[in-house]
UniProtKB/Swiss-Prot annotation:
Compartment annotation: Cytoplasm
Name of the featured protein: NADPH-dependent 7-cyano-7-deazaguanine reductase
Enzyme superclass (EC): oxidoreductase
Summary of subunit composition and partner proteins: Homodimer.
Gene3D superfamilies: 3.30.1130.10
Function: Catalyzes the NADPH-dependent reduction of 7-cyano-7-deazaguanine (preQ0) to 7-aminomethyl-7-deazaguanine (preQ1).
């Protein structure tokens, strides 16, 4: 089984410039999900939305082409893709010729779909429907000037002057305000930080929490988000941990957690988890991305 420790992270790596799908390194979601009590049917919906800022290939005449790429990986897929392997895979397009943009998109979709769904069919009937492919969108240079920058909407938790003493996840800080009427509100913070579980490099994020139910104590919520500061976990895993801690501790009627992480190696990852069916948020970067 692939683990973070035997991934390309933290290792000296040769950068290949000829297409090689074997560079992709999927890691099973199940191990970290078991830590937060998710072992059967998922209690959430959603996806991991990636943006690639460093994608290039050659056309059939050898002329370089560039694009921004957006990828949408369903959270029900059994695997995540380790980000350095994703970067190495994209770099392998650099000196590879493709007939057109559609050929690049098709290759990306096929390879990434195979990686995130790998091993999904081991115990599945041969008559079962094929798993969905991931979403792939390429944005060409003539549209670059239309790329917006938006901050996450919501009431800022960062306005609160709280004392912070916990720097590893402390779900006991989460609580609801007793004897208050139910609310529907959207809260945001720019203070989420965690670390890569292999290299220890910092991962910075803005997070948005939308919920309906008993009002969540905002000071405790901010302290809880700050408590991830020295925590070692991948982006997707942090967001699922936040979702499950809120879901089990505060018992909202509805809940959605969305984080936008700053880019590393030309890639950003923006996980979204929700307790109910809804459209994915627009994959629009914020100022720090």
């Amino acid at each position: 089984m692939n683990t973070p420790q035997n991934s390309p992270l933290g290792q000296a790596t040769a950068y290949l410039d000829q297409y090689d799908a074997s560079l992709l390194f999927p890691i099973a979601r199940a191990t970290k999900r078991a830590e937060i009590g998710v072992t059967g049917a998922l209690p959430f919906l959603g996806a991991d939305m990636w943006t690639a800022f460093e994608l290039s290939w050659l056309n059939l005449r050898g002329k370089p082409q560039v694009a921004l790429a957006r990828f949408t990986v369903p959270c029900e897929s059994p695997n995540i893709i380790e980000s350095k392997s994703f970067k190495l895979y994209l770099n392998s397009f650099n000196n590879t010729r493709f007939a057109d943009v559609d050929a690049v998109k098709a290759r990306l979709r096929a390879d990434l779909s195979e990686a995130v769904w790998r091993d999904a069919g081991k115990n599945v009937s041969p008559d079962a429907a094929a798993p969905p492919s991931i979403g792939v969108t390429l944005l060409l240079p003539e549209l670059f000037d239309r790329e917006p920058i938006y901050e996450l909407d919501g009431l800022s938790l960062d306005r609160l002057d709280v004392e912070c003493t916990h720097y590893t996840p402390a779900p006991d800080l989460l609580r609801v305000v007793p004897d208050e009427a139910p609310v529907s509100e959207v809260l945001v913070s720019n203070l989420l930080k965690s670390n890569c579980p292999v290299t220890g490099q910092p991962d910075w994020a803005s997070v948005q929490i939308s919920y309906s139910g008993a009002p969540i104590d905002q000071e405790g919520l901010l302290q809880y988000l700050v408590s991830f500061r020295n925590h070692n976990e991948f982006h997707e895993q942090c967001v699922e941990r936040i979702f499950m801690d809120l879901w089990t501790r505060c018992k909202p009627v509805r809940l959605a957690v969305y984080a936008r992480y700053t880019r590393r190696g030309g890639l950003d990852i923006n996980p979204f988890r929700t307790s109910y069916a809804q459209a994915l948020p627009a994959n629009v970067r914020n100022a720090r991305q």
